[in-house]
């Protein structure tokens, strides 16, 4: 992209439909913190636990700094906060005296720079950060330790699972700024033996897992990731762990495809079975939590036991440890609703589950798997074996939608040519078969021609669409029934009552609270097929319980003189499909005095 400010980028992305919530410039709060070199260290004359250091910070003369750190030697290069500097937490550093000796700055630890030992594994947490990076005296510390990136936070809607990835957002940015999107295709050299016979994969619940793929890496060398990878993870809000774990997290962020790595030694008989759990089965996950499973939850199991809760978290027993030598990379697709229920019931929502819940593209599994193995080779983290072990039941095919240019122009009140529309859609990965738009499988939100129109409007520019008055021959007016309701409402308000509005969805238990007989027609309610919860699972046949709930709330808040009324709808199922019944309820200061009419 052409150089631009974060604000310009955010405004353009937001206008094209990818809402930016904010951005953070790394190290923005760090000011006047530079590289210094310890020239000498002497004991403090009046404090046994303090030392006095002469430090060359790139200025005309060395500066004197008093510190209690014990991990310094002459010649060490360290971050130095000069007089008048600011740390990441907002702390101001000023010249002062410590036990009578002048100190003209402060040498910084990892924490004072907003870092941890995960960011720089060679450093220690509880001492001064001794730099091993190539740097010059007086150089701004932000450029030395990589605190010079900009992190942009997007608000991603649930219908755009493809945007839970860097590639997805890059595609949006390329279309927004009219640039070509150049995507890298993973290349795996492999050549370290055939994996045939080492692992057997079988999906026993294809309705919950359409595809499961795996690759094997031997001679694994578990070690810290290189700095560039640690920095990219950090700016994305992910803590670096080791090269293998970092690779799985990096691929998830880049491709939006959750990954997992098993220690092959822990896979009993070399068998992986994707199946429903058995009632009462137990597993301890990577966070050390014990879980009891039920038969509506999907697991990854070996010949005898679960080794992971599918789409949520791996098991502790099969995790990567320092002496791991052979690993299995997993890249699979799990049914979003199944993962959501499992994560909810087990009380553990993870980065992986939050992505699976949205519904991922099965065709993304293999590219992500190959990308992970490519990174293994790039980081010299192991030897990738030939072959992909896979069980594939997926039937994901691109959807085709007619491109009706005339209808889209009328719908948007535009006059774009069909070529202009095709150019916009092509930037989003769409292809064409005559007059049909071939929708990529990573865009499950594009279903109808109106969705195509929306994409064209987004990238043509909502601000370019001319404002026009709504045209129509009908004249709006209130119906007789609406006028009657308004008269009733105004009359009640004039009498000093307050109008309330309550939900039409209630719980079946409300009939018990108002002592409705078991055989009463009022209990024959319309049931909601997809309720938010038990409290909103049916349509009310009487507004009285809702009214009483509001009245009780007022009494609980010491409003004993509540005068309330509601013009409400009651939903009585009938064979003739009649319209719902309107009713009016009002209360006096006494909760026993409730009147109404229909």
Annotate each language-model stretch with its function:
Residues 401-560:
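Extended, well-folded interaction surfaces typified by the phenylalanyl-tRNA synthetase beta subunit core
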Residues 37-64, 248-317:
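Conserved mixed alpha/beta core segments that line enzyme active sites in large multi-domain catalysts
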Residues 177, 181-199, 382-407:
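Terminal amphipathic helices with adjacent charged low-complexity linkers/tails
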Residues 76-77, 161-175, 239-259, 304-322:
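Conserved phosphate/anionic-ligand binding catalytic regions in large, soluble enzymes, centered on
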Residues 586-597:
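Single conserved hydrophobic/aromatic residue that forms the stacking wall/gate
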Residues 1-193, 328, 344-347, 351, ...:
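Phosphate-backbone binding interfaces of nucleic-acid-interacting proteins
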Residues 105, 304-396:
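Mobile "lid/hinge" segments at catalytic clefts and subdomain interfaces of large enzymes
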Residues 11, 51, 177, 181-281:
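Glycine/proline-enriched, intrinsically flexible loops and inter-domain linkers
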